[in-house]
C-alpha cells in the first residue's frame, strides 16, 4: 500500500531481523494514521535532502522486535512514528541530521546515533512536535543534547 509518493506501508515495516527471527512485524490497523504521518514526514526529509532517496534501516517495530534489537522501552518505532535513515547521496548521518533541522522539517526528534545513522521521528497526528535534538555516541555515555560529531 502506497502511503505517499515515495514511501509504502511495506517499506516502513520491512525488517530483515524480523524475518530471520520469525517475528510478525505487522502493526495493528490503529497505527496506520501514525505510519502515514511518518511517511509524510519522510517526504519532507527527502525534499530537504534535494529529493535524494532515503535508505530506511528501521521503521515500525513491534514490541518483540524492538526488544530483540535492544530498542528503547518507549521507542517511537513501536508507535509507527520513527525511522532510522541514511542518505549516502546527500552526506554523512550527521549532515543528514543537520539538514533536516535547517530545512524546518519540524520533526519530533532527530538523533545522530553512534555516527552510523539518523533517527528521525514525527509527532502523532494532532500532537505538537518536541523538536528534540540529541546525539548518542555509546550506550555507556548515553544521550547528549544537540547534534554533535561522534568519535
Q: Model-derived features: where do they sit?
A:
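Catalytic cores and adjacent binding grooves of peptidoglycan-active enzymes
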Residues: 74, 87-151
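Extended, low-complexity, intrinsically disordered C-terminal regulatory tails
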Residues: 43-70
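Generic non-transmembrane alpha-helical segments
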Residues: 41-52, 95, 99-105
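Amphipathic alpha-helical interface surfaces
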Residues: 34, 38-41, 65, 81, ...
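A broad, low-specificity signal marking well-ordered, structured residues that form hydrophobic/aromatic
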Residues: 54, 83, 118
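Extracytoplasmic cell-surface/polysaccharide-interacting catalytic and binding patches
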Residues: 1-50, 138-151
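Active-site microenvironments of hydrolase-like enzyme catalytic domains
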Residues: 69-84
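Short, polar loop/linker segments at the starts of domains and inter-domain junctions
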Residues: 21-26, 71, 130-132
Amino acid at each position: 500500500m502506497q502511503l505517499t509518493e515515495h514511501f509504502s506501508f511495506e517499506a516502513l515495516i520491512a525488517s530483515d531481523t524480523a524475518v530471520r527471527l520469525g517475528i510478525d512485524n505487522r502493526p495493528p490497523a490503529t497505527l496506520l494514521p501514525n505510519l502515514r504521518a511518518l511517511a509524510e514526514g519522510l517526504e519532507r526529509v527527502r525534499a530537504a535532502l534535494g529529493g535524494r532517496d532515503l535508505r530506511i534501516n528501521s521503521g515500525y517495530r513491534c514490541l518483540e522486535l524492538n526488544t530483540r534489537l535492544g530498542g528503547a522501552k518507549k521507542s517511537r518505532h513501536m508507535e509507527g512514528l520513527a525511522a532510522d535513515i541514511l542518505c549516502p547521496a546527500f552526506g554523512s548521518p550527521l549532515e543528514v541530521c543537520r539538514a533536516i533541522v535547517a530545512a524546518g522539517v519540524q520533526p519530533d526528534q532527530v538523533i545522530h546515533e553512534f555516527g552510523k545513522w539518523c533517527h528521525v521521528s514525527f509527532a502523532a497526528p494532532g500532537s505538537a512536535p518536541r523538536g528534540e535534538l540529541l546525539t548518542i555516541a555509546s550506550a555507556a555515555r548515553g544521550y547528549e543534547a544537540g547534534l554533535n560529531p561522534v568519535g
